[in-house]
C-alpha cells in the first residue's frame, strides 16, 4: 500500500515538473501573463499537496544539505557564500518529513 502511495505522489511530482518546465519556457519569452497564471496554478497545487504532507524542499538561496539536496554543479559566484544554492535544476519533495526526491541544485564555490 505504501509503495502505491509513493507512486501516486511521484506522478503528482511529475505533473509539477511539467508545470515548472512550461513556466521556464514562457519566462524565456517574457510572457508574464502566462507565467503569472502558471504561478497561481502552482500555488494552488502546493496548498493542496501540503494538506497531504507532500512539501517542496526550499532550496534557492539556502545552503547545500546532502540530506535534501543533490549537487549537480558548482559555479563561481562572488555574490554568494560557499555552498549556497544559486540555481535549482529540479525541485525536491518530502512526504511526511521523508525525502522522496532530493532537489537537484547548483551551488556557489
Where are the regions that the model predicts?
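Charge-rich, N-proximal long alpha-helical rod segments
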Residues: 1-10
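Structured alpha/beta interaction-core segments
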Residues: 12-102, 106-109
Amino acid at each position: 500500500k505504501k509503495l502505491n502511495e509513493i507512486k501516486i505522489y511521484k506522478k503528482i511530482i511529475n505533473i509539477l515538473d511539467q508545470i515548472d518546465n512550461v513556466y521556464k519556457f514562457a519566462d524565456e519569452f517574457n510572457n508574464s501573463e502566462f507565467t503569472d497564471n502558471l504561478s497561481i496554478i502552482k500555488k494552488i497545487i502546493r496548498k493542496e499537496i501540503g494538506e497531504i504532507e507532500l512539501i517542496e524542499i526550499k532550496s534557492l538561496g539556502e545552503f547545500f544539505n546532502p540530506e535534501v539536496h543533490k549537487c549537480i554543479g558548482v559555479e563561481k559566484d562572488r555574490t554568494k557564500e560557499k555552498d549556497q544554492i544559486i540555481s535549482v535544476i529540479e525541485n525536491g519533495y518530502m512526504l511526511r518529513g521523508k525525502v522522496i526526491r532530493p532537489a537537484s541544485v547548483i551551488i556557489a564555490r
